[in-house]
Amino acid sequence: MKYVMVILGLLVLAAICCASEVEELDWRQEIARAILEAELQPEERDCKGLFRQCKKSSECCKGSSCESDLTGLCIFNLPGR
């Protein structure tokens, strides 16, 4: 009888552990999904971000400038330029 109770107790414990692992996995997937959704939505701003097409530096965000001669992309401001 004691062995049956021990086995039943272990089975219940195993079931609880499995259920908590499934909940933890769902929680991680929800966080990953939320991060991806936030990253994939376009930002609304008055300037163009890095590596976006531009024609003049005033179109690019602060800290970057348009390299229209070379690539036509907004890039980081380089020292000495």
UniProtKB/Swiss-Prot annotation:
Domain of life (superkingdom): Eukaryota
GO molecular function: ion channel inhibitor activity
UniProt entry keywords in alphabetical sequence: Amidation, Disulfide bond, Knottin, Secreted, Signal
Modified residues (Proline amide): P79
Localisation: Secreted
Propeptide: 20-45
Disulphide-bonded residues: C47-C61, C54-C66, C60-C74
Tissue-wise expression: Expressed by the venom gland.
Gene Ontology CC terms, in alphabetical order: extracellular region
Pfam family, one: Toxin_12
InterPro entries the UniProt entry points to: Huwentoxin-1 (IPR011696)
Secretion signal span: 1-19
Domain notes: The presence of a 'disulfide through disulfide knot' structurally defines this protein as a knottin.
UniProt function note: No toxicity is observed upon intracranial injection into mice and intrathorax injection into crickets.
Family: Belongs to the neurotoxin 10 (Hwtx-1) family.
UniProt-recorded name of the protein: U9-hexatoxin-Mg1a
